[in-house]
Amino acid sequence: MAAESTRNSSPPSTSQSSSPIINLPDDHLLTILLLLPVDSILSFSMTCKRYKSLACSDSLWEALCEREWGPTSVDALKLSSLRDGFSWMLMFQRVYKMDSVCCHKISDPDDDDEESSSFPIPRASHSLNFVNDHLVLFGGGCQGGRHLDDTWTSYVDKSNQSILKWKKVKSGTPSGRFGHTCIVIGEYLLLFGGINDRGERLNDTWIGQVFCHEGLSWKLLNVGSLQRPRPPPRGAHSACCIAEKKMVVHGGIGLNGVRLGDTWILELSEDFSSGTWHMVESPQLPPPRSGHTLTCIRENQVVLFGGRGLGYDVLDDVWILDIQEPCEEKWIQIFYDFQDVPEYASLPRVGHSATLVLGGRILIYGGEDSYRHRKDDFWVLDVKTIPSSGLKPQGLSLNGSSVWKKLDRISYGPKSRSFHRACADCSGRFLYVFGGMVDGLLQPAASSGLRFDGELFMVELVLGFSDLDHQQRPGKSM
């Protein structure tokens, strides 16, 4: 019966004799399809009924989603109710066509019905991470220019991600600071640098681990003697993880307020008890800056975007740190043609967030421009258009409209902000945002109003309007 079915759905015998692929069993064909781009798979599906059935199979598209988004996102989606009744092929289409976000307010100490003692005080330039199903918040700067040294955690229940309770933990924390970086590597947090309220720049490295019942333990990481290479003290730099046990640090504000343009990589030991720094040597280097972002997009590539440069100008350039071999790193600039992007003028920013989300794209939110006007917009940078290898030192030119997309926002709109912090959950579909600088009431003799914010809200990637049964896009009907 199987042989007869194959004959019925295959081209005539003359074609069979000239195309060996027709005689391949289905499991071999599926293996080949997994090596092809999605467009090629869709073209393959249009050749005959048998190939259409193969190319539309749920097992193939589940594997494609895992290939494109990573196994962590796919595993998280399997546990959620989002996929109920939907195939993986439809899920892929929804993520690919995603063009809007929905913001959900979770907590705000300014609300009359909230007890302020149960929340972290308003702050900016802190750190916020998602690790082991917990949000972890540390440090930052607050009213009066004071630094903070507190650590807060909140368990995120997969069944109800919009109800969270903060808990202040005693953890033997690092000294107070703001403008530091804190990244997730496996089940660990890695914190570096920052500035204290005496204006001192720091270059210490701490490693933290979250335990059950929201416990957290910090310890100073051993990076060798003072004679060993290490980054100079700094704050307002950027950092991200790369590979399995490496942290990349770039730029920031160093001693005497000088903006830096150097790049360093910290490689952790197998047991996470120590690390070794080395400085990246590259023919091309991004200009010095602070308040920018680094986002890991692949095991061997990091994206740098924006920040404030030497002349206090706010930047919109994009660079790729390409690591094809250990200690063979190179920076490559990505050039865009923005003629077809009318809203491009709003892209330059500093103090924004840039987070890798579901679909393998970078979600950029907020920040401020050269005039310190804070933003509330969401942009997506589609890094799938950037090759994973073969990048040339002279850079790469791409069509801006195929790479950048401004997203619509549905329902609740958070205040415009800068120097907030954001992190995504395991699925990459939900983004948590806390704090930052927001516009406040204009004070007497002040040129502008400015205040620290203590709001926590969740940003949801909208995968089709059916996700929001009772909400509508402004100006459009469901």
UniProtKB/Swiss-Prot annotation:
Keywords tagged on the record: Kelch repeat, Repeat
Transmembrane segments: none
Domain F-box: 18-64
Regions of compositional bias (Low complexity) in chain numbering: 9-20
Chain intervals for the UniProt region annotation (Disordered): 1-20
InterPro entries assigned to the protein according to its UniProt record, in alphabetical order: F-box-like_dom_sf (IPR036047), F-box_dom (IPR001810), Kelch-typ_b-propeller (IPR015915)
Kelch repeat spans: 135-187, 246-299
Alphabetized Gene3D superfamilies for the sequence: 1.20.1280.50, Kelch-type beta propeller
UniProt cross-references to SUPFAM superfamilies, sorted A to Z: F-box domain, Kelch motif
Designated name of the protein: F-box/kelch-repeat protein At1g51550
Organism, as annotated: Arabidopsis thaliana (Mouse-ear cress)
